[in-house]
């Protein structure tokens, strides 16, 4: 199986999605920083998950129309800005708005990542490619909590967002070098399979 730029970008995006579990470790610190009740912290998760779930399928369909590569690049840019916003939020309300933007951009990224995987390899290699993609996502899920714990030992809760800003820079460079920003790149000939769209819900 030939490893292409779009495939690498998709796998890096999968790893990124798993790393968001680092946020859970920061809940006590976020609660204290914004002086909110413990019951309110659930909105940190709800604001992200609800936005992500609602927009995931439309993002995949939009990728079918204008190219999954361009949608991926847009998602990467907005996600990076969302991490900066989360890190600099001065109030809980602004922080939740940042989480909404993070959920929306993650929908753009993961709504197109499975399509990038399948479109970048031959049909014969698609099962293996999707398996590698799933493994990178699982690696992110496994690493998120330990990474979050290490960051909180050294810095404030904002670090669980700030450390991903450089990651997004690397991901954006990789996407641009792969030509994903060009019109029509990685455009599906057929609508994205429902299973692939739901793989990250």
Each language-model region and where it sits:
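Transmembrane-helix bundle of Major Facilitator Superfamily
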Residues: 1-181
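Transmembrane alpha-helical segments of multi-pass membrane proteins
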Residues: 43, 196-197
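Flexible cytoplasmic inter-helical loops of multi-pass small-molecule transporters
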Residues: 181-194
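Conserved small/polar residues in nucleotide/adenosyl-binding loops
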Residues: 199-201
């Amino acid at each position: 199986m030939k490893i292409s730029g779009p495939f690498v970008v998709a796998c890096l995006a999968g790893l990124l999605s798993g790393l968001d579990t680092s946020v859970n470790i920061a809940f006590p610190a976020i609660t204290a920083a914004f002086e909110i009740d413990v019951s309110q912290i659930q909105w940190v998760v709800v604001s992200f998950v609800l936005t992500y779930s609602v927009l995931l399928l439309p993002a995949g369909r939009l990728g079918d129309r204008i190219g999954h590569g361009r949608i991926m690049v847009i998602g990467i840019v907005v996600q990076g800005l969302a991490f900066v916003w989360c890190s600099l939020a001065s109030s809980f309300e602004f922080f939740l708005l940042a989480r909404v933007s993070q959920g929306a951009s993650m929908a753009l990224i993961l709504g197109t990542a499975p399509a990038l995987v399948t479109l970048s390899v031959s049909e014969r290699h698609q099962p293996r490619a999707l398996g590698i993609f799933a493994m990178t996502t699982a690696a992110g899920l496994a690493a998120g909590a330990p990474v979050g714990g290490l960051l909180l030992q050294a810095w404030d809760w904002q670090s669980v967002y700030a450390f991903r800003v450089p990651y997004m820079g690397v991901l954006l460079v990789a996407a641009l070098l792969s030509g994903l920003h060009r019109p029509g790149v990685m455009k599906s000939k057929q609508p994205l399979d429902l299973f692939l769209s739901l793989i990250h819900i």
